[in-house]
Amino acid sequence: MNSLKISDNEYALIEHPGFANNKDAFFQTLGGVQSIQKACQTSFQNPKQALLELNLRPKDKYHHPVQARVQSRNDLLVTIKKMDNSVQNVSRIRQVFLFRDMADFQYSTQNSPFVQKLDSTLRVLDYNAINKFSIDLTPVQRKHVDMPPPPVFSQTSLPMSYNFLQNPLVGRVRLPNGKTTIVNLKGQCRVWIITTNMGVESVPTCRHSKLGEPSKTIQEVIEALKPLFEKRPVWTRRALLNHLDPSYTHYLKFALPYLSYLWTSGPFRDTYTRFGYDPRKDSNAAAYQALFFKLKLNGKHKGTKTHVFDGKTLFPTNRVYQVCDIVDPTIAPLLKDTQLRSECHRDTGWYRSGRYYKVRDLMREKLFALIEGEMPSEVAVNMILNAEEVEESDRYSNFDEQDNTDLNDTVRGLNTSATDDRINDLMRNLMKRSQEHEGFEDLEEIDDDYDDIFGD
């Protein structure tokens, strides 16, 4: 086997993106022979300082060149004769100039009178021509602005690697009729939960028709839920989780559709109710009504995942409280010792509106204080407790029908005593805190923790 000695000579390689049919034109695109020699010499001494630019229009002074990137290599340079395929002049290639950047946007100045005047005077470096050069400042309405282009249009030098691929989770399947369609092969398992609202005449009595037979694990969760729904027909998801084994947490959302339906509006919103049980027809269901609060907390608020409200501890993960789970000594008696409605109201349920809104205001005040890390103000609590319980018909009266003079007199009458002044101060502070937190308004949409009421 023949061996060849590698020469001590070292070379730099230039990868030109064009065809070198004309040697002189080839050198001009790289700035000339001197520019090439200087760049190659610098690449061996300090590669980061080596500058070699590719100009595809060498005669255009406003052309934006493409700069080469220098990379270190350990390649071989050989000369091969076609006649006998002999190899000679083996040398090393240490540096390579690569033009991998994208060319910048180009702007032709060929038809620009201002650029032509600028080139014929300033670029020739003639004193007399420069002395005669002037810019016409007369306002003229031009269709196009005549001025030199900027040095750079785009700062993006490397192309984006989009790597376009077909969605791996989507595939084409053949239907029974012979046609093909594109389906999601690995879509999320759908939870066939039946939902209802306060406007329906009757509640669901059985599970969804598309709900298949449960798996072994789901059946275990169902068996654990049955005694809970027999004891209490209406539950929140958080309350059920606290009564089940922690290992069932992930499977709860798949088991609930076999035993219950979900309320999407009204006083039982976001509660799971046993099939066949209609809380609108049973006054005892007042204990299962739910109160909703929107809390906006920062990361420092952490607590246990309980569904019980005692008025002293903040539980950030719970935004929905059922009446039977409220044990606060101030609020609980208000819910027990009150006269219920004869029919279930679509907004306040079995409770009269005056008592319902008083309880809601008390809970809001206590939750505000807990967010601040303080105990609720006794003055604010007593003010809410002593407030008149206004029924809904009076609470939402049409003020447009009232005389403006009478209304102004009523407002002026609020400031007739020191007690009223104190109440006004408290209300202003309460409004200020509401604006700061943006944290407590009755839920018009489900909170972050309840974006997926099925548990995702």
Curated annotation (Swiss-Prot):
Record Pfam families:
Tau95 (PF09734), Tau95_N (PF17682)
GO biological process terms on file? transcription initiation at RNA polymerase III promoter
Top-rank taxon, per record: Eukaryota
Subunit structure comment from the entry: Component of the TFIIIC complex including sfc1, sfc3, sfc4, sfc6 and sfc7. The subunits are organized in two globular domains, tauA and tauB, connected by a proteolysis-sensitive and flexible linker. Interacts with sfc3, sfc4 and sfc6.
Q: Name one GO cellular component term.
A: nucleus
**What protein name does the entry list?**
Transcription factor tau subunit sfc1
**Ranges of biased composition (kind: Acidic residues):** 441-456
Q: Composition bias, kind Polar residues: at what positions?
A: 407-416
Chain segments carrying region Disordered = 394-416, 437-456
The encoding gene is sfc1
Q: Which keywords, in A-to-Z order, does the entry hold? A: DNA-binding, Nucleus, Phosphoprotein, Transcription, Transcription regulation
Molecular function terms in GO for this entry?
RNA polymerase III cis-regulatory region sequence-specific DNA binding; RNA polymerase III general transcription initiation factor activity
Cell compartments where the protein resides: Nucleus
